[in-house]
Regions:
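FAD-binding core/adjacent interface of flavoenzyme oxidoreductases
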Residues: 1-9, 67-156, 232-240, 251, ...
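Beta1-alpha1 glycine-rich phosphate/pyrophosphate-binding loop at the start
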Residues: 4-68, 72, 144-147, 153-199, ...
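A Rossmann-like FAD-binding core segment of flavoenzymes
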Residues: 70-97, 174-261, 356-388
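Predominantly flavin-linked oxidoreductase catalytic cores and closely associated redox partners
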Residues: 104-105, 111-208, 213-222, 289-292, ...
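FAD-site-proximal beta/loop scaffold in flavoenzymes
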Residues: 114, 136-146, 249-300
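Mid-to-C-terminal Rossmann-like scaffold of FAD/NAD(P)H-dependent oxidoreductases
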Residues: 304, 312, 316-385
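Short, aromatic- and glycine-rich surface loops/edge beta-strands on solvent-exposed regions
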Residues: 360, 373, 403-421
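Aromatic sugar-binding surface patches on proteins
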Residues: 392-401
């Protein structure tokens, strides 16, 4: 059995950034395992621009952004295996993987970074009524067909869900000559970034119908029409609000789920809100020596934030490998999301071990206008940040300062909540 200091599962933007950071922090024996035929992950099919504004201070396409990190991996001589499927991670950090060249691989790791990304909700998970003809795709599948294979999924399109991929595909299909008739969103707010709504829908006069869902799909062999209806506060269709659209394709953009089957086999505790691992300030999971970053941890809007978190995870994994497993556990303070905050990453902070400035990222559960993000140490208000608009589709963040925590050594809990301005 071959032994590595660090095994990174996933060669997308998170895995690449984590590998580079670990190498730069003194770890040489690193292996990246990637199930696709190339590094770069989902970025390879995201040929639109808008990437890299934070990381490189310039606007790049997805493949360009990935290429910069792939170049850094190659320059550092970091080993990677492509077309390699990881099947299991044991409690002893033994990774079982398979590929055509090596057959079954058993690899022992001192530390593991989980960077498997996320997947789309399928039609089956959405329980849409109607027939099951050809022409129903997830937005990511349609994106792969158009951008990677040069194939058009359809000419007349209805999109269910207003996640970022759905919004971007509304624009992409329009640019390729299709007619996007409507984007329907179950919730009373969009699940995507404001800039994507403007650039992908408003600029192309594509209607967005909030509080609407698909209630019927017609067609025996191919999609012929879909019926959408308005939904009430209980998210059930309101009789009499039905609208029928003739179309040959239905794209589904109804949310992303972190890909955590391997995390479960490794015994990692998962969050009920994000479906990703519960991590502390070093991005270490409930299992010592297993770290997580990127969309496997929680779904991001911007790849730049993925790279930032992955860089921190890589650096912390390197520190763990050098120090070995510590018997004495540092004091862990829980970060409690309350009053409109759905979750936080990280979920725990170790005041003695944390960086001087720790970025805590979170999402809100509804649209809020002219509110403040309040941070409390127990019942003591520490900071307030005013925000004009907050929406579930846009990630928020606050900075926790180590020196501030040291001023309140008796703190038992950190609370982040939304309050009136």
């Amino acid at each position: 059995m071959k032994t590595y200091d660090l095994i990174i599962i996933g060669g997308g933007p998170a895995g690449l950034a984590a590998a580079v950071a670990a190498k730069d922090n003194g770890i040489d024996n690193i292996l990246i395992l990637e199930r696709d035929k190339s590094l770069g992950g989902i970025l390879q099919q995201c040929i639109h621009n808008g990437f890299g504004l934070h990381t490189f201070k310039e606007e790049l396409t997805g493949p360009e952004y990935a290429a910069r990190f792939i170049e850094q991996v190659e320059e550092r001589g970091i080993e990677y295996k492509l077309n390699t499927m990881v099947m299991d991670i044991s409690l002893e950090k033994v990774v079982t993987a398979t590929n055509r060249e090596d057959g079954i691989l058993l690899l022992q790791a001192k530390a593991i970074i989980l960077a498997m990304g996320c997947r789309e909700r399928s039609r089956g998970a959405l329980n849409i009524p109607g027939y099951r003809p050809a022409g129903i795709y997830s937005a990511g599948t349609a994106q792969h067909l158009v951008n990677m294979e040069g194939l058009m999924p359809g000419k007349e399109v209805v999109i269910l869900g207003s996640g970022d991929i759905g919004l971007i595909m509304a624009r992409r299909m329009t640019l390729e000559g299709a007619k996007v008739k409507v984007v329907a969103e179950l919730m009373p707010y969009s699940g995507g970034l404001k800039r994507n709504i403007v650039q992908c829908l408003d600029d192309f006069d594509i209607p967005l119908k909030l509080s609407h869902t698909v209630i019927d799909i017609e067609g025996k062999h191919r999609v012929e029409a879909v019926t959408i209806a308005e939904v009430g506060p209980d998210r059930k269709p309101i009789p009499g609000t039905e609208e029928r659209y003739t179309c040959d394709s239905l794209l589904l953009s109804c949310g992303l789920l972190p890909e955590n089957e391997l995390s479960k086999s490794a015994g990692v505790e998962l969050s009920q809100v994000t479906s990703g691992p519960v991590v502390n300030d070093s991005f270490e999971t409930s299992v010592a020596g297993i770290f997580a970053c990127g969309n496997v941890l929680h779904v991001h809007d911007l790849v730049d934030f993925v790279s930032q978190e992955a860089t921190a995870a890589g650096k912390n994994a390197a520190a763990y490998i050098k120090a070995g497993e510590k018997d004495a556990q540092a004091v862990m303070l829980p970060i409690s999301p309350e009053g409109g905050v759905r979750y936080t990453v990280p979920s725990f902070v170790r005041p003695s071990e944390m960086e001087e400035n720790l970025t805590v990222r979170f999402r809100v559960g509804d649209v809020y206008k002219n509110k403040v993000i309040a941070v409390y140490f127990d019942d003591q208000l520490i900071s307030k940040k005013k925000r004009q608009v907050m929406a579930p589709g846009e990630m928020e963040q606050v900075i926790l300062k180590k020196n501030k925590l040291e001023e309140y050594p008796e703190t038992k809990k950190i609370t982040i909540r939304i309050e009136e301005a």
